[in-house]
């Protein structure tokens, strides 16, 4: 009688059952990832211990909101018409933009910077508002800081990768050069002697000259009220109250 278990058709797997318990088997990728995770956690703990002593200092994420006093100097207020899909040049210190009557609009004796203070930063602030009610669009802006002195910008450009203006329709640019502020003293005397000399020799010697374009994402021509101003971030050597247990600045 033929037997299915004869030597001719014998298989070593017949009659045997293998049961693998995953409790004792680990995926190789899981083992490597787990080891790397533990190694990264140990490195992170060591880094945090080294940085613990910095917890007593405060740093402002937005330099505009950081320590110091903001002093605003309005340059001009104007109404500009902006056509769809275009941006209009509103600030150009390389050309004749500010060599006109707007200089005299804010020249006064009550300049806020006095001798015992220094300029930490200068911000160009452009505030935009629609002149017509019930308009639904967003403001766009672009700027450049490192233009060649001989560069002549166009009055109108096409919209290419602009940035949307944030809260309060205010576009704010820090004009500080790399390395920080402007340790210039006796600013009030420089200002009262010659305002144009103050701008050229004091401000633009330590800060960048900006070129700014503004526009809208509207499909129609829009009328915009612009208020352009310089905001000086003033360092106070004797602050009224310290920010924290560490140094104030």
From Swiss-Prot:
Look up keyword Ribosomal protein and say if it applies.
no
Q: May I have one GO cellular component term?
A: viral occlusion body
Q: Which UniProt keywords apply?
A: Viral occlusion body
Q: Which organism is it from?
A: Spodoptera littoralis nuclear polyhedrosis virus (SlNPV)
Protein name as catalogued: Polyhedrin
Question: Which one of the record's GO molecular function terms can you name?
Answer: structural molecule activity
The protein's role, per its UniProt record: Major component of the virus occlusion bodies, which are large proteinaceous structures (polyhedra), that protect the virus from the outside environment for extended periods until they are ingested by insect larvae.
| InterPro entries hit by this protein | Polyhedrin
Protein family (similarity comment): Belongs to the polyhedrin family.
């Amino acid at each position: 009688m033929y037997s299915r278990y004869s030597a001719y058709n014998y298989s070593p797997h017949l009659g045997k059952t293998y049961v693998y318990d995953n409790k004792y088997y680990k995926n190789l990728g899981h083992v490597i990832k787990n080891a790397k995770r533990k190694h990264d956690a140990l490195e992170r703990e060591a880094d945090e211990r080294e940085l613990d002593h910095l917890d007593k200092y405060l740093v402002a994420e937005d330099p505009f909101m950081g320590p110091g006093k903001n002093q605003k100097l309005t340059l001009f207020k104007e109404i500009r018409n902006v056509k769809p899909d275009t941006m209009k040049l509103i600030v150009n210190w390389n050309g004749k933009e500010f060599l006109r009557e707007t200089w005299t609009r804010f020249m006064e004796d009550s300049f806020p910077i006095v001798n015992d203070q220094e300029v930490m930063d200068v911000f160009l602030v452009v505030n935009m508002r629609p002149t017509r009610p019930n308009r639904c669009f967003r403001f766009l802006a672009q700027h450049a800081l490192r233009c060649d002195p001989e560069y002549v910008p166009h009055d109108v450009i096409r919209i290419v990768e602009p940035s949307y203006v944030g809260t309060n329709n205010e576009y704010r640019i820090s004009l500080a050069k790399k390395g920080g502020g402007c340790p210039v003293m006796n600013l009030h005397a420089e200002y009262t002697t010659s305002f144009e000399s103050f701008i050229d020799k004091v401000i633009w010697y330590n800060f960048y000259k900006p070129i700014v374009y503004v526009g809208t994402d509207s499909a129609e021509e829009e009328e915009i009220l612009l208020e352009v101003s310089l905001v000086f971030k003033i360092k106070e050597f004797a602050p009224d109250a310290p920010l924290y247990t560490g140094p104030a600045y």
